[in-house]
Amino acid sequence: MSQEIWADVLGYVRKNISEVEYHTWFAPLKNLGVQDGSLVLGVRNSFAQEWLRKQYQGLLEDALRSLGAQHPQVSFQVLPASQDALLLPSDPPPAPISPGRAPAPPPADNRKTLNPKYTFENFVVGPNNNLAHAAALAVAESPGKAYNPLFIYGDVGLGKTHLMHAVGHYIAERFPEKRIEYVSTETFTNELINAIREDKTTQFRNRYRSVDLLLVDDIQFLAGKERTQEEFFHTFNALYENHKQIILSSDRPPKDIQTLEGRLRSRFEWGLITDIQSPEFETRVAILKMNAEHNRIDIPQEVLELIARQVTTNIRELEGALMRVVAFSSLNNVPFSRAVASKALSNVFAPQEVKVEMMDVLRQVASHFNMPPDVIRGSGRVREVVVPRQVAQYLIRDLTDHSLPEIGQFFGRDHSTVMHAISKVTEQLGKDSELTAAVETLRRKMKGLEDEDSRA
């Protein structure tokens, strides 16, 4: 593929994503041409290869389609190390060491301050955090070059610390010679106080000013601490001038941190400021699923969904709720169920009305009638398929706020067909004992009052 066409592809992509995403994932790509009818793009590593394939292959194919390609195909190829180096910006020249600066200590274990549980591999990406994740990965790929400093803010328990440690692990893996230091602002302050008291400020400064990556959590606690702000200001300058990467986290953006010196606030805004929001339902379910798999817990999808609907605040509470349900099930020797989960969480989280979605109903009906959901939504007209379809449409109308046209669209039918199905089920209730029992059982399940495996 010519570079002109490739430039058009990138132009299309750039219009449809954020600048952070573009510079993180697309700017480094290498056009390797067309092979066997597929556009082949060179990437840095297998992580980027898999991420691009999952997240952006469709966008690239749309770009090719917009340029006239009939059946566009895109593949990603990991480049050899020698070619990979061509994708990264060259290292900036190191700043001269100031006269009298103490020599850096010899390299130590560069992961000693990192939590081994927090890596990119077990960080669940969703719409609430995709930009922060992309920025963190860009920094990990090119420390000191991409965004410096990287400032991540958001409420407690949303994954800021996880991302910071993930960057540390990634850099430690790729650059074992790099010195990495993670510290909370409270610890930094306490260590400074001790250093002043014991006349060890030189050692303190050398420790934090000789690192290649400095990760500082809860930087908002610098507010009001004049001596700590003064020390951190000079630490920041020393690292920045030597092109060392700085990542900061906070519960608010720099402009909202009261009693923070203006010179620090302006420096915090030099790089990229990105936030993490509370995860939406699908991301919460994915987080629970990953946590359960990591701990080798076999728990039904519907139970995970109930927990995700019940706990909407932050990830820590979400994971805590999962462990509470697991403990409740184990201690009471009862299998996992929606009812068990509701009871386990009832004394901790305020009960919330569970919002039932159309797919929830379809899934339950499919399970009850032992039939794939796609078959129920399909065009089959035999009684074995029609009855479950009518029951699903009846329950969706009964348990959700969706209109007849919306239900019809979900099933690929018009609203009059749905109206007929609902009337048919309504007419048979009380007459057909088998149908009545099925509807009542499914209704109780959807309200979380009964589970197909057990009852609490």
Swiss-Prot record:
Gene Ontology terms: cellular component: cytoplasm; plasma membrane
Location of the region described as Domain III, AAA+ region in the Swiss-Prot/TrEMBL record: 113-329
Compositional bias per record (Pro residues), positions renumbered to this chain: 90-108
Keyword Amino-acid biosynthesis appears in the UniProt entry: no
Compartments, as annotated in UniProt: Cytoplasm
Keyword list, A-Z: ATP-binding, Cytoplasm, DNA replication, DNA-binding, Lipid-binding, Nucleotide-binding
Region (Domain IV, binds dsDNA): 330-456
Region called Disordered, residue ranges: 89-112
Region (Domain II): 79-112
Stretch list, region Domain I, interacts with DnaA modulators: 1-79
BP GO terms, sorted: DNA replication initiation; regulation of DNA replication
Major site of localization recorded for this protein: cytoplasm
Binding annotation for ATP: 157, 159-161
Molecular function terms, GO-annotated: ATP binding; ATP hydrolysis activity; DNA replication origin binding; lipid binding
Notes on the domains: Domain I is involved in oligomerization and binding regulators, domain II is flexibile and of varying length in different bacteria, domain III forms the AAA+ region, while domain IV binds dsDNA.
Record note on quaternary structure: Oligomerizes as a right-handed, spiral filament on DNA at oriC.
Matches recorded under HAMAP family: DnaA_bact (MF_00377)
Function, in words: Plays an essential role in the initiation and regulation of chromosomal replication. ATP-DnaA binds to the origin of replication (oriC) to initiate formation of the DNA replication initiation complex once per cell cycle. Binds the DnaA box (a 9 base pair repeat at the origin) and separates the double-stranded (ds)DNA. Forms a right-handed helical filament on oriC DNA; dsDNA binds to the exterior of the filament while single-stranded (ss)DNA is stabiized in the filament's interior.
Family as reported in the entry's similarity comment: Belongs to the DnaA family.
Name assigned to this protein: Chromosomal replication initiator protein DnaA
Upper lineage: Bacteria, Thermotogati, Deinococcota, Deinococci, Deinococcales
